[in-house]
Amino acid sequence: MKIDPNKEKALNAVLGQIEKQFGKGSIMKLGEDRSMDVETISTGSLALDVALGAGGLPMGRIVEIYGPESSGKTTLTLEVIAAAQKQGKTCAFIDAEHALDPIYAKKLGVDIDNLLCSQPDTGEQALEICDALTRSGAVDVIVVDSVAALTPKAEIEGEIGDSHMGLAARMMSQAMRKLAGNLKQSNTLLIFINQIRMKIGVMFGNPETTTGGNALKFYASVRLDIRRTGAIKDREEVIGNETRVKVVKNKIAAPFKQAEFQILYGQGINSTGELVDLGVQHKLIEKAGAWYSYKGDKIGQGRANAGKYLIENPAISDEIETTLRAMLLGNGEKVSADSADTAGDNIDLETGEVF
């Protein structure tokens, strides 16, 4: 498409002004084939890392992960913590819901002996702890579970039934203003888990909204909408969930991508199954009938056995993952078998949410 030279000059000038005023990545072309040069931490899902465009969640930023109950929100954050700890990073978990299961966290690969954990009494206390950890510069990843459980002190000290209109929203708004700059200075990743509520009286459009007001929506560099789309069965027994994650906001790469993966009960994200699928799609792994082969050697009959082979042979698994990351992220390719553009979806112009 040809653009008038004068208009192009004016456009470049205003884009430069916007980036200078609001920071790099505040505006970009939707199809632009680049991502911000930021340090990232893997989500545990290669498809989601690709959908994010930068290879994972960005350091020094605020991330919001929201979805219905039992959709995999906490599991996803624990996978991020496990990946960060493998890189030698220090992580903290602010358990406002008082529901963290250390046994499950350990199964997902989290080093619970070195994971900092706090169960605050009030929302203000939780956010002050976040701020103190951030300003220390010693903590790399902080997870808050969840925004809905950050109860203002006035509400806790009051009686059930008392009206506390807008208290949580004001508390979150003040915290965001305080935290955003400190996170950038200390290069700390702050992840908020959030719950979904329904707006009353919405006749058209999406009635869903998240708790804690609008401040978090604006301050978050990445917002992920996670949903359970189906059940994984072994004969009659349900052993996991089919999961879809939509990147509804992304300030480090183009947004509105999505990824699909499996979460297995007691194991977390089925990363080896994902490697098999992506390997076949990108012709890294050969599939002949039910048999899967890698570099001429058979690795298993059926997807489950091929995945089991990769678990038993971590060196080969790492080699396949490294090659896939170079193919999908190194040359800018952003769409995979499990990540697709959602341009056909409806977009809430006020919040930027896809529904």
Curated annotation (Swiss-Prot):
Q: Which GO terms describe its cellular component?
A: cytosol
Q: Which domain of life is it from?
A: Bacteria
| Localisation per UniProt entry | Cytoplasm
MF-aspect GO terms: ATP binding; ATP hydrolysis activity; ATP-dependent DNA damage sensor activity; damaged DNA binding; single-stranded DNA binding
Question: Which key words tag this protein in UniProt?
Answer: ATP-binding, Cytoplasm, DNA damage, DNA recombination, DNA repair, DNA-binding, Nucleotide-binding, SOS response
GO terms, biological process:
DNA recombination; DNA repair; SOS response
Q: What is its main location?
A: cytoplasm
The residues listed in the UniProt record as binding ATP, with positions renumbered to this chain, are G67, P68, E69, S70, S71, G72, K73, T74
Q: Which InterPro entries match?
A: AAA+_ATPase (IPR003593), DNA_recomb/repair_RecA (IPR013765), DNA_recomb/repair_RecA_CS (IPR020584), P-loop_NTPase (IPR027417), RecA-like_C (IPR049261), RecA-like_N (IPR049428), RecA_ATP-bd (IPR020588), RecA_C_sf (IPR023400)
List the SMART domains.
Answer: AAA (SM00382)
Q: Gene3D superfamilies of this UniProt entry?
A: P-loop containing nucleotide triphosphate hydrolases
Q: Pfam families annotated for this entry?
A: RecA (PF00154), RecA_C (PF21096)
Keyword Ligase part of the UniProt annotation: no
Protein family (similarity comment): Belongs to the RecA family.
- Output the HAMAP family linked to this UniProt entry: RecA
Cited function: Can catalyze the hydrolysis of ATP in the presence of single-stranded DNA, the ATP-dependent uptake of single-stranded DNA by duplex DNA, and the ATP-dependent hybridization of homologous single-stranded DNAs. It interacts with LexA causing its activation and leading to its autocatalytic cleavage.
Protein name stated in the entry = Protein RecA
Which species? Answer: Shewanella pealeana (strain ATCC 700345 / ANG-SQ1)
